[in-house]
Amino acid sequence: RRLGTDLYPDVTFPFVTVSTVYPGASPEDVEESITRPIEDAVSSIAGVDRVFSLSRENVSLVFIQFKLSVPIGQAVQNARDKVGIAQGQLPLGSEQPVIAQYDISAQPVLVFSAASGADPVAFRELLNDRVRPRIEQIDGVAAVRIQGGAEPEVLVELFPERLSALGLTPGAVFQRIQAEHLDLPGGRYPAGSLEVGVRVKGEFQSVDEIRAMPVATGPDGSLVRLGDVALVRAGPKEVRTIVRTNGVESVSLEVVKQAGANTAVVANAVKKLLPELEAQHRFQAQILIDQAVTIEANAHEVWIAIFFGGAMAILIILVFLLDGRGTFISSLALPTSVIGTLFAMYAMGFSLNQLTLLGLSLAIGLLIDDAVVVRESITRRLEAGQDPATAASEGTREIALAVMATTFTLVAVFVPVAFMSGIVGQFFREFGLTISVAVLISLFIAFTLDPMLSARLAKARRPGEAHEASGPVATRIRAFFDANDRIYARTLDWVLRHKVLTAAAATLLFVGSLGVAGALGSEFLPNEDRNQLVVNLEYPPGTSLPTSSARSGALEKAVRELPGVAAVYAVIGPSEDVRLARWRVNLVDKNARAESDEAYKEKIRAILAKDRLLLTSAVSDPPTLEGLGDWPPILMRVVGRDFDVLRKEAARMIEV
């Protein structure tokens, strides 16, 4: 229970992101005024591997990839120092850059949509002020991010002619509003035996206060207030992102877990709370992304494989030994080794994830090998007439060196896997160490528990006495083994008499295997049918949000009508880029539908092909690691200073 459950091990990616918002700026302005100064500043940081950026309307994203040898804390601090120096070059009106370490554990473990017939602004405030704090109180929840809906804001529309008459500029008014909208510390003063802190409250509390703010002095010496030179009104913020669930506009909430928290436990706790929140605040929630379902399904399948593999291993031992007591003694090595390995995993801070469970499942056959070899050696001495205690002692001592050599050979194979360099090494560290620890524990058990039980439970035999099992089934099994022995002896005799031919055949098989290996594809992590698809749409530059929303909505409707589609969750204008749309298509469980996810990809592509305005579209599996995004298998970057030339070259490459 104390071992965390997750999809993959916790890994640290050496990435730092610098995001800067520049309201109202075009991508070209963002590139020139924000992105380049930041890129120039951070490129000189020691340990930087490469820097790449993304400049969009209103926002600049600079990604800094460090070498794995650089401590991530030091990398973040160095980036913060350099960006702080470059901040003086950024234009007036741009917001302060936000520097953040990329953390894969900070990705949502649960995403759900919330819909209501209430006022959009009031509903978002309800979710932000009432629902989010309740969810964040759950143990293991780090934060809840809200996307979509309408946010309140105060709009100030300046009258240019009045500003001109007073000699004011929009920039001066903007700075005046910033200067007035502040809470400042005012020091402290003694009050008897106490000391009272003083704070000057200057933040606006209402729209009327904003209207009444002085901005200048008139020709007659009277105060000119903001309401005299501008229309000041409260209203919803301009919508740049639309969230829809099955065609209905909604708000999405993304639940992010704390580092090291149990993903499945956190997600299930949130799902348990949702019905109460729905009833209390009168909204409808729908689960869109649930990491717990994937984790629990994968863990269940692996545990089934582990138990089935263990049962088959014990059955095979029984068939070969034909000795109930011997099988019982040897089979005890399996659960004791697994339990010991779980304790070791807990001590090393590992979680139960696909890599550690894969290591355990692969080790099942290895865990019992040492005990079987020791038990077989003891059995031979028992059949020679030795008493159980002597047979256990001398039988174990006889094969100790061989068993140790076999075990340490396995350790020598898997320990280097745990210490591979790069991100791959971080992923497979827990895998390699889990297998290595498991076989070492099995060696310890084979040299301690197995001989002890053999000395106490094994039955002494007279020389030449038969096995315990002596029925007709045991007789047939022994006859089968005897026949195999004769076949093996004849085969071995032939091989020894035709050494050249045998060596040539082995060489041919080796060379052929190299050819087959080269023809096989390779992946960092395998794709699987997870009952979800990701759809990305891109419309031409200049496409408005209403146009993108309407066209995406028509396509969403066509996809929802496909049999086997459970839900379509769409975000139009992700990161406020209104010409983009991103969907999550939830399919019914793969065991309940006749077609694979690949068939649905083709159907969705056929639907998307009907929209002639689409610039590009892509249908793919969800990212294996949610935090890494859905990067394509091949990514080409066209670099240059002239955007028109870049667009032409990119279009030419797409045609090729």
Tell me the role of every PLM-derived stretch:
Residues 1-26, 84-94, 350, 418-427, ...:
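Transmembrane helices with small-residue packing motifs
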Residues 1-311, 320, 329, 352, ...:
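Membrane-proximal extracytoplasmic
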Residues 288, 295, 299, 375, ...:
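Helix-loop junctions and hydrophobic alpha-helical segments within the transmembrane domains
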